[in-house]
Amino acid sequence: FVWSNQLGISTSSGADGSFELELPAASSPNGGGIADGDYIIYFFISNYELSTVEVTFASGEILNDNRIIKIDGELRKKVNLRRMVQINTSVQPSIFPKNFEEDVKVIIKATPDRSDIFFYLKGLEIPRQPTVYSGLLIKDISSGELVLSFNPDTAGTIKRVIDKPYREFDINFEIINDSLGSIIPPGTYEALPYIIIESNDNVPAHILNALESGYNEFSEEYFKYPIYRTGGKFTITE
């Protein structure tokens, strides 16, 4: 998530990290343009440390900087973000038929680079029994749409510390309903467990406020939460 609080503009980077920020066209501040001065651009991924770049505008144009930015607005160097926790999701089995009647297991493996990482997950806490984790969203790879969500009505939000060297959480779900019909048609999907990340780093409120509304809710809006994770893909066959 790329954001400038002073300019009030934002965008999301592509899969390769590239992005474009569309600046106001007018050169006059009264006309919606940019006043002379220094502006900070923030780069936010929830499981990475916040990174910033400062650029300078004069007469509505970016000033050329031999270290940071070219006059045409292209950054001279890649923006590097330092990882706080690595997140990998695996689905077992990763390929199965649409009439598969056993549980599908989703394993979240969190490997922290720091000792102050916390996850907010969904699940059921039952006295003297292991926590049952839920909060699973299934996304269709081809359309990018939500096709299935798994989270019992009685599930709540659970906070967990992510200890070194790593911590794992399991979610089990079924693709067969009570009438033995497949809930999901054949295709390729991605399992996205609901995770909101917290650390001792204070993310400025204006960044969180600038995110799409509902990013922290258990719904399709969660897809807009800036988080980098690997794995999670699985295929359902005929």
What are these regions (language model features)?
Residues 1-4:
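Hydrophobic beta-strand segments
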Residues 57-94, 233-238:
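Extracellular beta-sheet/turn segments enriched in Thr/Pro/Gly and aliphatic residues
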